[in-house]
Amino acid sequence: MEFPFDVDALFPERITVLDQHLRPPARRPGTTTPARVDLQQQIMTIIDELGKASAKAQHLPAPITSASRMQSNRHVMYILKDTSARPAGKGAIVGFLKVGYKKLFVLDDREAHNEVEPLCILDFYIHESLQRHGHGRELFQHMLQKERVEPHQLAIDRPSQKLLKFLNKHYNLETTVPQVNNFVIFEGFFAHQHPPARKLPPKRAEGDIKPYSSSDREFLKVAVEPPWPLNRAPRRATPPAHPPPRSSSLGNSPERGPLRPFVPEQELLRSLRLCPPHPTARLLLATDPGGSPAQRRRTR
């Protein structure tokens, strides 16, 4: 695939790795360096054209690879250039491979759901005129070494029949594990996968959470505290030297002393008459201007 600018100068290496920042690779010493904005624009043009060519080859309604998608996702793109062909001294692009990590729910051979985050093949394209020349295997092998993964550990997003034949021919990937999504995984995918931790659904909070562990909960199940007021700790008071006698009545408090005997009303009034008045009461009667001795006798 040719472009109106110098691809060989833009991509010094045979295989260039681009991330979401789309930064131009380091320039060779002694080469003319255009403005950085122009270099990034050229990279975006290459990515857009490669995405359109890949969508056309796979009969997709719209490209799944573009510069805007690369900038908004944490994907990695491997671009292979043709070092032998230099039309008009500008170089050419052979193809590309786009990968990225994704969280997936996949089924194993026992049809159990597993939450994994494998490296996924998201898009793969080699120019039609350069296929069956070993370029695809070279690009794929470079990606495996760079990402440090094995072919059976990959998940492929909507692979074409050409890609499935390619993987079967070069990496002996044939037996697939049926899935309910658009990703394809092969036998041996779970060989190096750690078993996922079983997560229980969160429970609705009921009241305050008590700060004790599960072992403390088991202990509390054995030693159940009695209800109030039986759970109140008794007060340790110093017993008196001569404790008062307790009443045998069930309605009286055990701490209350014996009641005084009942006094008849007539005897109570007689004792009040014989009781001498208080000095303060005498003073009030003496200072009362309207009170006569006769009236005081009648009121008494």
From Swiss-Prot:
GO biological process assignments: alpha-tubulin acetylation; microtubule cytoskeleton organization; neuron development; regulation of microtubule cytoskeleton organization
SUPFAM superfamilies noted in UniProt: Acyl-CoA N-acyltransferases (Nat) (SSF55729)
Free-text description of this protein's post-translational modifications in UniProt: Autoacetylation strongly increases tubulin acetylation.
Binding site for acetyl-CoA: 124-137, 160-169
Gene Ontology terms, MF aspect: L-lysine N-acetyltransferase activity, acting on acetyl phosphate as donor; tubulin N-acetyltransferase activity
Asymmetric dimethylarginine modification, residue list: 282
Site (Crucial for catalytic activity) location in chain: 58
Gene3D superfamilies according to UniProt: 3.40.630.30, 6.20.370.120
EC number(s) on file: 2.3.1.108
Domain of life of the organism encoding this protein: Eukaryota
Residues the record lists as Omega-N-methylarginine modifications: 300
Predominant localisation class: cytoplasm
Residue segments, region Disordered: 229-263, 280-300
Keywords per UniProt: Acetylation, Acyltransferase, Cell junction, Cell projection, Coated pit, Cytoplasm, Cytoskeleton, Membrane, Methylation, Phosphoprotein, Transferase
Transmembrane residue ranges: none
A Pfam short name: Acetyltransf_16
Reactions accelerated catalytically: L-lysyl-[alpha-tubulin] + acetyl-CoA = N(6)-acetyl-L-lysyl-[alpha-tubulin] + CoA + H(+)
Family to which this protein belongs: Belongs to the acetyltransferase ATAT1 family.
Subunit architecture: Component of the BBSome complex. Interacts with AP2 alpha-adaptins, including AP2A2, but not with AP1 gamma-adaptin (AP1G1/AP1G2); this interaction is required for efficient alpha-tubulin acetylation, hence clathrin-coated pits are sites of microtubule acetylation.
Functional description taken from the UniProt entry: Specifically acetylates 'Lys-40' in alpha-tubulin on the lumenal side of microtubules. Promotes microtubule destabilization and accelerates microtubule dynamics; this activity may be independent of acetylation activity. Acetylates alpha-tubulin with a slow enzymatic rate, due to a catalytic site that is not optimized for acetyl transfer. Enters the microtubule through each end and diffuses quickly throughout the lumen of microtubules.
Annotated protein name in UniProt: Alpha-tubulin N-acetyltransferase 1
Species, as recorded: Sus scrofa (Pig)
Gene: ATAT1
